């Protein structure tokens, strides 16, 4: 449970960020494209499943497993008020086995926030607060693949194909889980 001081600080910071974003959204669109919505920061437009990837060179047969990374990928970004830390979580992964690249998948974390932004339906599970975007870290813990964020929402469990199963609560933890 957050302390009274923490609640007041979060409320003040949230109000300031929302006020700043609202101001930015009223500005006319700039002549140039938004720096965090182009180039290497440009959001992926869709989820992909690519199988039996072509490999240049060799992958050692002993290198087996899934490499996954996560980051913000706004579903419907507003270029007038976008910050690159803020964005729906998207996990990317590549599965290696027997000297081959079996697949590449990228998947949105099926949060309630993503659903409210017009994305696919949210996965089940407990929530802490109305904003449940996770977009900072992905790790394996006790046999589960978890997507996390440092700001407070519960982690989301992912299956072996990186699809969202549900949010997960470790009830004895009252602070962020990363």
Protein language model features and the residues they cover:
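Intrinsically disordered, low-structural-confidence terminal and linker regions
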Residues: 1-47, 51
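Beta-propeller domains
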Residues: 41-45, 55-63, 77-126, 148-170
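Short, glycine-/Ser/Thr-/acidic-enriched flexible segments
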Residues: 74
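Structural signature of eukaryotic scaffold interfaces centered on beta-propeller domains
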Residues: 124-141
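Entry beta-strands of beta-propeller and related beta-repeat scaffolds
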Residues: 144-145
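Conserved small/polar residues in nucleotide/adenosyl-binding loops
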Residues: 171-177
